[in-house]
Amino acid sequence: MNMAESHLDPSKLATGPAGFGAAAGQRPLAPLNAKIEVKNLNFFYNQFHALKNINLSIPEGKVTAFIGPSGCGKSTLLRTFNKMYALYPEQRAEGEIVMDGENLLQSKLDISLLRARIGMVFQKPTPFPMSIYDNIAFGVKMFERLTRSEMDDRVEWALTKAALWNEVKDKLSQSGYGLSGGQQQRLCIARGIAIRPEVLLLDEPCSALDPISTGRIEELIAELKSDYTVVIVTHNMQQAARCSDYTAYMYLGELIEFGETEKIFIKPARKETEDYITGRFG
């Protein structure tokens, strides 16, 4: 079944551990405009089976949140999308992660190009030990040859998209370390989008931030989905409810339920999901 043949309402594709109503081991049903399709994905840390037969379609131009208790596999799943595990030979993924018809798990895929297409922002702000300007320009220089004027425009564009330009435009030559925690995280988001990825992965982007900075990041996430497909891992269920269009609940390496965020939080199909959402578990 290809996307052209799918006429299913994404709001109805929300039950079963395998996601979208598919039984474990079966090919998942894809909503219209799926940006990433995960098919029978298993992940191992040595002999530990961390992800078990994950089937999931990430809708394009939407914010998808992964929730679940610590150790459930949500960050592991996120990091398979851009092969962050590739440096560790004891870690391996089996199955398929398909974007634009290409299996991202193929070993011959260029990792640098993959990570240009799928950007990532980590839990703690990680500015480079260089100026604010160079933090943005660094990644761009790896993939594009721009004139100084073009680079200036790109830096301003990225910082503006990250809602940071007005705060730093007069101190671009200063170190990124001089920014507040919230500003540093927005700098990292600007750095991620400067190379114009198709997908942006956010792994607990607000966990180290104060409430005001968290609010700014959440507003930014809502704006970014007009240009990117965004996937966020969060322990904060209120944040998932506020920011995301779709939510996946995971437990012990399995995808328990996936669907529209409003339905997941108001009327989940699975009792396990309801127990977690209401605080009776996890």
Curated annotation (Swiss-Prot):
BP GO annotations: phosphate ion transmembrane transport
Record InterPro entries: AAA+_ATPase, ABC_transporter-like_ATP-bd, ABC_transporter-like_CS, P-loop_NTPase, PstB-like
Q: Name one GO molecular function term.
A: ATP hydrolysis activity
- What SMART domains does UniProt report for this protein, alphabetically? AAA (SM00382)
Superkingdom, natural source: Bacteria
Keywords attached to this Swiss-Prot or TrEMBL record, sorted alphabetically, are: ATP-binding, Cell inner membrane, Cell membrane, Membrane, Nucleotide-binding, Phosphate transport, Translocase, Transport
Decide whether keyword Ribonucleoprotein is in the record: no
The residues that the entry says bind ATP are G68, P69, S70, G71, C72, G73, K74, S75
Provide the membrane topology annotation.
Answer: Peripheral membrane protein
Per the record, the major location class is membrane
Recorded catalytic reaction(s): these are: phosphate(out) + ATP + H2O = ADP + 2 phosphate(in) + H(+)
Cited Pfam families: ABC_tran
ABC transporter domain residues: 36-277
Ion transport among keywords = no
The record's subcellular locations are: Cell inner membrane
Q: What is its EC number?
A: 7.3.2.1
The Gene Ontology CC terms held by the record are: plasma membrane
Assembly, per entry: The complex is composed of two ATP-binding proteins (PstB), two transmembrane proteins (PstC and PstA) and a solute-binding protein (PstS).
Q: Which family does it belong to?
A: Belongs to the ABC transporter superfamily. Phosphate importer (TC 3.A.1.7) family.
Check the record and name the PANTHER family matching this protein.
ABC TRANSPORTER I FAMILY MEMBER 17, PHOSPHATE IMPORT ATP-BINDING PROTEIN PSTB
Role summary = Part of the ABC transporter complex PstSACB involved in phosphate import. Responsible for energy coupling to the transport system.
In Swiss-Prot or TrEMBL terms, this protein is called Phosphate import ATP-binding protein PstB
Please state the gene responsible for encoding this protein.
Answer: pstB
